[in-house]
Amino acid sequence: MNRISVAVLSCLLCLGVTHAWAQSPAPASLSVADEKGWTAYLGFQGSSNTFGQVMDLDSNLGYNFGPHFSLDGGVPIYFVRGTNALGNSVSNNGLGDMYANLRLKFRNPTVNYFTTLTGYAPTGDTASGLSTGRAMWDWNNRFDRSFGRLTPFVEVGIGDTVPITRFYNRPYTTLGYNSQLKGGVQYALWRYLSVGAAGYAVEPWGQQKVFSKLNKRNELVGGADLARDNGFNTWMAVSPSQFVDLELGYDRSVHYSLNTVTFGLGVNVGRLFHQQHAGQ
């Protein structure tokens, strides 16, 4: 790493934070069908590296208006374990920011397009690093096309916070404009099992603020390098039934020379309810 990268990482570690790429605000998008009706999804996911673990329990409720348009929202409950700047073990639990997603989906034989606009309400505790204390937003766009079992994809996003996505749960919250780029492939090994790999880059600009989830009442303010990152991740996803999703992943932050293991468990409560109701 260059001197700037080392300095930024040192500052982050002094706040007790680590960098991570990963969880989507609405994991329900992975398993919710396109049919019209209510959706409900319960997800538990987390990330672990040498500095600690960040996990969250996310309950998501939404409504599909048809094959193209849907709304959903929820609020995560965080469980944070790690080591602070003094070397002491710390834990921090609590509600995060409530979020709402507006989704548009356009499936086409040439290329599929999915766009999600996410808004965050400052319901989390700022002193605990679970919120910035301000409303935030993020806009993500995904393009993919399947060639048999192989599905290449590209994601492009912009917002005023580095979003949490599926494969990385970071122990801090950011406030500041940034763009995100991710590209990779997913391969279906068989009906219930798939693997994937992707490279990513987060490119911020302007003033950035970082709120630690490990050291209370700690806020770091700096330039674009504070939130910049790039690297790659790999994952394996298993769906043993149409109601359950399991994921295991690995992330390598090249910018910070940091390795992280991630996991996810999701239950499609809405689909389970609809099937039981239809069977009556």
Place the predicted regions along the sequence by residue.
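Outer membrane beta-barrel transmembrane domains
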Residues: 82-83, 180, 184-280
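Outer-membrane beta-barrel translocator domains and adjoining extracellular loop/strand segments
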Residues: 52-58, 82-89, 125-133, 163-172, ...
